[in-house]
Amino acid sequence: MLSDYLSTVDWSRAQFAMTAIYHWLFVPLTLGLGFLVAIMETLYVRTKDPFWLRTTKFWMRLFGINFAIGVATGLILEFEFGTNWSNYSHFVGDIFGAPLAIEGILAFFLESTFIAVMFFGWRKVSRGFHLTATWLTAFGANLSAWWILVANSWMQYPVGCDFNLETVRNEMTSFSAVALSPVAVNKFFHTVTSSFVLAALFVVGVSAWYLLRRREQLMARRSIAIASAFGFVFALVTAFTGDRSGAIVARVQPMKLAAMEALYDGQQGAPLTAVGILRPEAQRTGGDAFYFRIDIPKMLSLMSFRSADAFVPGINDLVYGNEEYGVMPASEKIERGRVAVEELGRYRTAREKGDTAAITEIEAKFDRSTPQGAEFLREHFAYFGYGYFSSPEQIVPDVSLLFYSFRVMVGAGCFFILLLGLVWWLNRRDRLASKRWLLRTAVWSVPLAYLASQAGWVVAEVGRQPWAIQDLMPVGVAASKIPSGSVSVTFFLFLALFTALLAAELSIMFRQIKTGPKDD
């Protein structure tokens, strides 16, 4: 069933991944740098020191360049849902569209309104009003992130909705359940705090570059003082929310957790692999999954279920089942899901033929207010999405990509905590400028921060595969039935456009950094 649209699905996935990766190159800096600029402007308003005005305008200029390119790259993403993922849009558009609409109407207008005051309001409005505009721009950008992350979190953990048999759509039943789900709340805080860390590293890295060249040393030291403290605090918060993410994933997406750890066979007191080299063939042939590994005993069980002796299901348990621990095999879920898919097909046929007896019979099965309906929904429709798979092995994501991406993200996060703490401490004691090795490390930490941020999204999105909506809709079913050639052409057009935008951003940013702060 899915093979008919395989090439279209692949091109659609590649296009969305490419545009999302490019867009996310700009978003985290916007989320964090806005608050750093607001802090610096607050210091200017409180002290009336022209130094802080000059410093604020410099970082604000870099913020504006990044913001503009970020908006341009983000517009295309929402249109892709209608063009490449029309089945998805029909099936859950009522739910998924709501937070995106709120983001566009409320949050984006907030930031786009006040950013005009922020950039063009100097000497035209009072200092207090301008400062308020700067803070509201930063809050508006993060409010936009909230609603977008709510939509993404619903794809990971679909709640607050009910299936409407007549329209064959999932419809929202509780907005608060969607907007305030534990996945959405934790994902928001983990994403924005990690973005704050990236922005802090950007400011520290650029300032370190100035110190290496013995330029703008006062601005560099004071910028580092603010950014390193800001980044260190939020790096710790990111670690905390990351730990919470692991516990949530263990509960709602166990296959993602098993793939992240390359855990093929579940076990009690499962260890966490700190470092390891995978045997790629292990996914096909079995046997030891690693050439080499360093484990932390029982840590995976402790982090996932807050018990050192808890059972963590592995990939094989989730695919083939584990009767001892009550893990249902994927083959049974597929069979149950096919019953639901077949009933929907029967319902469609019955409506076309006007078969009222069949319509009444099937509607009773989907009526959760009756014992028969509640049982059918629990025993069969709960596994609806599985009905589109032909084999249990199809539910396994790319283990190697997840395993290494997760370790890049976590390893970089731990490194950033140490780096920012050390930079703050040495800068406070006026010893940072003499540590040229550390300044170079700070400069090179900037691209590492972007790599870690992208790796985090790889873990989140690749780990959900093969689902567009966890347990409800596979990616292959979500795609539009359009020629693959159409998608491939737009893929390369967008690739060229986004590459040009990235090149323009880097060129302008590097030129502005090289020029440095400007005197009024």
Name the predicted role of every residue range.
Residues M1-D520:
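Polytopic transmembrane helical bundles with strong interfacial aromatic enrichment
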